[in-house]
Amino acid sequence: MKTEKFDRRTFIRTAGAAALAAAGGLSLGKSHADAYRVPISSGSAAPKLKAPANACDCHMHFYDDRFPVAASATLRPPNATVEDYRLLQKRIGTSRTVIVTPSTYGTDNRPSLEAAAILGPSARVVAVVDDTVTDAELKRLATLGVRGIRFNLVQKGATSLDMVEPLAKRVHDLGWHVQIHMLGDQIVQIADLLLRLPAPIVFDHLGRVPQPMGVDHPSYGVILGLVDKGRAWVKVSGAYHDTKVGPPDYADTSAVGRAFVKAAPERMVWGSDWPHPTVKEIASKPDDAILFNLLTGWAPDESTLRRVLVDNPATLYGFE
């Protein structure tokens, strides 16, 4: 009887451990490292940096082949789902999300809005619209969690430069911002236009400041000037886009990120840029843990880190 009792208890303990492991993304016989493996991302280790509660990933995209690709699309990545993304959240420790409609879908924001509905109150959306959008549609988008519009003039498609100022005036009344994805040289060329915009500006991916000039490039000064005037924010994201050095330190683009955060920590937000759509080969995708760890050098103290990951996103996107 004693043996039977011991065996039953052992079975219960083992079954319970297996259930807990499965709930946490582990299985018996599966390595701890594999628990952090994320689709469309390289590496499998957890980041060294511990994310504070309510940390926000302010730049990512969803892809879903149930929705039509825009005729003008130059990027056509594979599916990247909410289920996939939740594995990334588990890996890096973020809980809030800003979904950016990618150029792949033109002005079709349905993939982003559907994902936001699944993620719930922890998600916001930056939409893509053109000059045919109605005021009623803008108001509808606001009720669905949209807090800004994006102009991607790197992967050109649904929007164009002549739409920026008129649409900025319209969305300003909704309390939205205008997100700009342009190369550094483009930003310098339209500096006067940017100064005229009534809505706040959010610059994608470190402002795409070119390397190897980095902070010596005129675009850095243009962006920082707008930040200093309280007119702009910067996403310290996408360190892999313009690097000439590469991982793990991304020393050249990291210098830009560090400079931006030091100059104006109250106007910086961070984003993963998952699933890294400009990197077409799955095997070449960046390691998201390494990208997240860069913040240890850019925001080296706990107060600054909390600003970048929690407080600033709450202000910019309206998280409570």
Short names for language-model regions:
Residues 2-32, 36-54, 79-96, 265-266, ...:
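Mid-to-C-terminal alpha-helical segments outside catalytic/metal-binding sites
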Residues 35-39, 104-195, 235-247:
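Active-site gating/metal-coordination segments in enzymes
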Residues 54-68:
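Di-metal (Zn2+ and/or Mg2+/Mn2+) metal-binding site signature of metallo-dependent hydrolases
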Residues 56-60, 97-100, 125-127, 149-151, ...:
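Hydrophobic faces of well-ordered beta-strands that scaffold small-molecule active sites
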Residues 59, 112, 171, 234, ...:
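Conserved, mostly hydrophobic/aromatic
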Residues 71-119:
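Alpha-helical scaffold segments that flank or form the walls of functional sites
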Residues 81-85, 108, 133-136, 187-188, ...:
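Alpha-helical scaffolding within the catalytic cores
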Residues 158-270, 278:
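Catalytic pocket-lining loop regions of alpha/beta-barrel enzymes
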